[in-house]
Curated annotation (Swiss-Prot):
Pathway: Amino-acid biosynthesis; L-cysteine biosynthesis; L-cysteine from L-serine: step 2/2
Listed NCBIfam families: cysK, cysKM
GO biological process: cysteine biosynthetic process from serine
Gene name for this UniProt entry: cysK
Protein name according to UniProt: Cysteine synthase
Complex and partners: Homodimer.
Top-level enzyme category: transferase
């Protein structure tokens, strides 16, 4: 059924499609379904939390049109906030590690946002520190995606129920999501555990920065995952297991899915699909594995992920 016209672009956030992977999954493995979050108007899963955090602040009287928002971001949350701010009449300033892709930087600027780069060696901690400095100096409002309860709550209210409705009572045996802020995993995981008591919730993190597994933080190339610390927005009780994914493994899988499935996915999506394939092999035929593809590969055309010699 075609969607009826809406009054605001923010009204078309959510209700993203789910697609079965057919060519990268072994015949004797579980079925794998991916939720295409890059179909949101701002191009990623982070559109959901961007709108949720802004609307929460509006309800609480913390912001009004014309005010300035500041936020540390590895890219997609900033892009989501930038487009929401543009639509609602707010100014936006973002701090982000200098290691993030050129497309992400350009997208932020295209929406009229100001961008402040921080040292890549400091990862997200450096961006968070700089955002707090700007907030204190100028009195900006900071949504704080790593602390804001609206982050996991919006996934509990929308993403999780969408999956339950999309699978129409069918069993979901495992749900996997990469952990950046942990909002998606926490919110969706809570919903699915109520609906499917035997579902396995799996956290995905960078092999090079295995903080959730008890390891040390470190630099990695899985943009949007592995902040280098355990965020307040992550419910560490919701997941049952952790799968670590390497830089090259995630990139190779993202490229393969583009070639073999026609799905142009980002780096963290490559990590999600690789982890889903491992879980599908473990569970075996007849089971159902679901994961989220956070962003589109077009955001990585200037990076080694999709750089071609000719």
């Amino acid at each position: 059924m075609a969607q009826k016209p809406v009054d605001y672009v923010t009204q078309i956030i959510g209700n993203t499609p789910v697609v079965k992977l057919r060519n990268v999954v072994d015949d004797d493995a579980a079925d794998i379904y991916v939720k295409l979050e890059y179909q949101n108007p701002g191009g990623s899963v982070k559109d959901r939390i961007a709108l949720a955090m802004i609307e929460k602040a509006e309800r609480e009287g913390k912001i009004k049109p014309g005010d300035t928002i500041v936020e540390p971001t590895s890219g997609n949350t900033g892009i989501g906030l930038a487009f929401v701010c543009a639509a609602k009449g707010y100014k936006a300033v973002f701090t982000m590690p200098e290691t993030m892709s050129q497309e992400r930087r350009n997208l932020l600027k295209a929406y009229g946002a100001e961008l402040v780069l921080t040292p890549g060696s400091e990862a997200m901690k450096g961006a968070i520190k700089k955002a707090k400095e700007l907030k204190e100096e100028h009195g900006y409002f900071e949504p704080q995606q790593f602390e804001n309860p609206a982050n996991p709550e919006i996934h509990e209210l929308t993403t999780g129920p969408e999956l339950v409705e999309q699978f129409e009572g069918r069993q979901i045996d495992a749900f996997l999501a990469g952990v950046g802020t942990g909002g998606t995993l926490s919110g969706v995981g809570k919903v699915l555990k109520k609906e499917y008591p035997n579902v396995e919730i799996v956290a995905i993190e960078p092999e090079a920065s295995p903080v959730l597994s008890g390891g040390e933080p470190g630099p990695h190339k899985l943009q949007g995952l592995g902040a280098g610390f355990v965020p307040d927005t992550l419910n560490t009780e919701v997941y049952d297991s952790i799968i670590k994914v390497g830089n090259d493994t995630a990139m190779d899988m993202a490229r393969r899915v583009a070639r073999e499935e026609g799905i142009l996915a980002g780096i963290s999506s490559g990590a999600a699909i690789y982890a889903a394939i491992q879980k599908a092999k473990e569970l075996g035929k007849g089971k159902t594995v679901v994961t989220v593809l956070p962003s589109n590969g077009e955001r990585y055309l200037s990076t080694p992920l999709y750089s071609f010699d000719n």
